[in-house]
Amino acid sequence: MACVKSVPCCEAERGEDMKKTWYLIIGVVLLVIGGIAYGYHEHHKPKTAQELKTVRVAYLLITHALPVFATEELETPDGPVHVELVKYGSWPELMDALNTGKVDAAAVLVELGVKAREQGIDVRAAALGHTEGNIIIVNNDINSVQDLKGKSFAIPHKQSTQKILVDLMFERAGLSEKDVQIVEMSPPEMPSALAVGQIAGYSVAEPFGSLALEMGKGKVFEDPDHLWHDNICCALVFNGKFVDEHHDLAKAFTKAYLDAGKYLDEHPEAQKEISLKYMKFKDSVIERSLKVIGFGDLALTEDRYNALVHHMTHIDLIKNVPSYSEFVDQSLLP
């Protein structure tokens, strides 16, 4: 009889358990639906006015990126563009972000942009980052190019103006990479590597040349302008998809960028002020670095482009040269 009486109790307990299970299932389903709805809302909600005019720009912490910094500094709340700067620690990392659309534009080695275009990646240049501004530094005991034979010499990247300048310097002296070991090295590491004798010299963007001079661990070895007159190095390069989808914004940013370059050229004091705000170096290092760089003429002309790809071809950095119109998007110019 005890078993018979327990049946209703067991059934009641099972019923309560089933209710709890269903409540739990319903709760989970509602949470999932709520999460999906929230995600959909966040993805599709209207962008704010600032978001609609935001351009994400990648950069490395070098003097060559000064026009990008100045563009942000000169930005006004009611202006057509909002700049969102994204700092990277190396050129490969930065180029990956540009190529994949993680950023909209970048201040980047122009050779990397041309090489990406050769590889079928849709990137488009609008302007230069500066003129001149490169430096070749060697140990204090190096007195001729021949003294570099058998030693290591650093550059920031194989696809760079620094690589071109170094190859031209060696070529004039009758040397090649068989005689001097060329190593790629992050610019911030170069001054200390020179100081401890890891390398005998390097070619780099400022202020990392001036930093070695400030430390008393190196000296200027060669004037890059004597190797390649009017040499170009960095450029403002856009992700092609961003340009297609936001052409007016890309054009507005290009104008703001060129205006910033003109402002820097006309206000030398602003060059130092903005540089010190973004780059934590001594005043003397920044002052020295700014003496060898210009921002007044940022036009990536066809003549400049032809000189660039001539040198790139000459030292085997590129095989299939993109045409000027393929790489430089003149529709972005004011």
Where do the protein language model's features map onto the residues?
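N-terminal Sec-pathway targeting helices
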Residues: D17-L30
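Short, solvent-exposed loop/beta-turn-alpha elements that line the ligand-binding surface or hinge
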Residues: E75-V81, H226-W228, F295-E302
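Short, Lys/Arg-enriched N-terminal segments with co-localized hydrophobic residues
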Residues: M1-D17
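Ligand-binding clefts/hinges and TM-proximal coupling segments of bilobed small-molecule sensing domains
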Residues: G34-Y40, H82, S160-Q181, K255-V285, ...
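Secondary-structure end/capping motifs
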Residues: D244-K319
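Short, glycine-/small- and polar/acidic-enriched structural segments
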Residues: E42-L175, Q181-E184, A200-E206, K219-F221, ...
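Pocket-lining segment of extracytoplasmic ligand-binding domains
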Residues: V110-L112, V183, P188-S275
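Conserved C-terminal helix/tail region of periplasmic/extracytoplasmic solute-binding proteins
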Residues: T313-P334
